[in-house]
Amino acid sequence: GSVVASYPYDDSPTHRLTGVYSKSADDEVFKYLAKAYASHHPIMRTGKPNCPGEEAETFPDGITNGAQWYDVEGGMQDYNYVWANCFEITLELSCCKYPPTSELPKEWENNRESLLAFIEKV
């Protein structure tokens, strides 16, 4: 996990593991939506999730193009965009995939304003 808003494409023509910006035709719209979420999140907006073992990982403005972060061939985000015209972003909300129940109220507070801002945009 991490704390970042990721947008298409997750796959790239070269299928390199990381570092390839795979721009969609709607790249500016996706960046706008990802920033709408990230800019209201207290951790995501810093671009420094500081996840254990990945402390050096950073995301400018708290967002990333999926394939630039890591290549995912055949992912749902790309499939939905290409085949269903669904503008989908992926939200990584925690360094921990399954945070303990005791942390859920804090996670809600971290994400509430982001979620409302995102809903207003879409």
Could you tell me what each predicted segment is?
Residues 1-122:
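Metallocarboxypeptidase
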